Each structure stands twice: as structure tokens, then as C-alpha cells.
Amino acid sequence: SVTAAPQEDEIPRADGDDAAATDTSALIWYRYGDEPMLAAERRTVSRLPNEPYETALLRLLLEGPSLDAPALRGLFPAGTRVISTSRQGEMLFVTLSYQLMNGYSDEPSNWRSDTAWAQEVPLRRRLAMQAIAATVTENTTAQQVVILLEQRGETTDSLRLRQKYYTLNAADDALADPLRRDESLLLTASGTMRTILTCIQQRDIRRLYRYLAQSDPDTGEARMEYEAFASKWTEYPALTAFDFSGGSASGTRAVFTVSGTRLADGVSQKFTCLLYTSPSPRDGATSR
């Protein structure tokens, strides 16, 4: 469902070590399928006595999405742990275990020579860090996140994460920049609408299909098979330009006013219509 970000006075605070154990609700950002995007799942964050809220929040992120969200995927190598978190004003310092630098279990050894994997491997690392930034900024007042890395006997002048995490170049020892929220990677209500309209404009039918609901939320009718969907799509006019506004949330949907031009039988036509997105980890980020 579309869920508004928490207001500042609703954000749990855990700056002291004497905080009591508590359960709170939070939006945790995970990868949406194989897409280069993140989608949020609302989860219950169980905080242990004296555990900072930010630590519990990121622990849940690293564990991966729940079984109720089959469309979402975790982003961190096996064994990666949150060792500690510390707030300094609007900056959150996060220390992660050394496993962060490990490869993923499904990465082929020759990934650099494979065109698809050569794009996928760096993308995973970028999305993993953005998942941290998005989850932290969504649920706390922190604006930036600095990642520190557990050291295992190495001699170094800083615990800061290095650029080689992103570039996968062992010689790239420059310090990584603090993480900031990047809305272009997030399937918020507006982000989902923009992605879907872009798919329509580019006639990327296979990708568009991944953003359709598994079933109609109003009627319960199941999504048609891809072959039928792709065949039917050839009947529709081409979308040549679009813009949208609104995004007011109501219940389980966010409604947008979409305008633009479409090309039908060689004739350009202007149009305006209402569309809505209904991001749901059960069905994926969806649109009608």
C-alpha cells in the first residue's frame, strides 16, 4: 500500500543507552525484483533493551524482506551484520561487518567478462547503499549516512568505506562519500508512476508487465498472462510525451492526473486521464 513518510514527531528516538525495548512500524527499502529500483515494505522493528533504534532498523534491512513480500529481494552478501550505529547531529555513522565486501553467492567468477553481470554487480552495491540511506532517512531525522567497515588486522588510516566497494577496483582507496537519499532509485508513488509511463513510452512491454498487479485490487481478477498482454498491447496508440501531477494518497492507492500526447493511426492526439499506483510488496509496485 502507499504509506506516507512518518512525521518528525512520530519518528522513534533512541539516542540514549537506557531506551526500553519496544516494537515500532517502519518502511524498509529492498530491491524490487531484478529492477534497478527499490520498493518499501512496512515491517515491525523489534528493538532490544538498550539497542539504538537505528541499529534495529538496519538489522531488519540486512535480514532481507519478509515472506509476505515475494516481489522484493535482499541486497547484502550473506553474513553481513550491523555492528554499531552512532548519531552525530543529522549524520548517522554505521559500522558494518567485513562480509559487506564479499561477493554475492550467485556471482560468476568471470562476471567482468559477462556484459549483463558487469552491469549487475556494481548495481547491486549501489542499491545496497541506497537501501541504507533510504531506510534511515525514511524513519529517522538523519540526513546523511557514513558507512564504516569492520577491520580484520589491516593497517588503515580510516574505517570509512572506500570507493573500491563501488568500482570493484582493489587499488581505489579513495573514501566513499556519505550516503544521501536518491529519489530516482525509489519506487515511491510518483517514482512508480514515472517508471511505468516511461516503460509505456519506450514500448518496453516486458518491463512494464513486471509492474502490473498480480490481481485487480477491486475485482480480484488475476493478471493476464504475458503473451496475451504483449499481444493486446500492439493495439494501443504510442505514447509520445507525458507529464503527471498529484499523487494524493487514499487508502491503498495514489491518484495522479496524467496528460500528454499519443500517436494513433499517424495522428497526434492530446489526452488527460486519471491513473493510480498501488505499491504493494505482495504484488509488486502496481498500476492501473
Where are each of the predicted segments found?
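Bimodal "functional hotspot" detector
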Residues: 1-282, 288
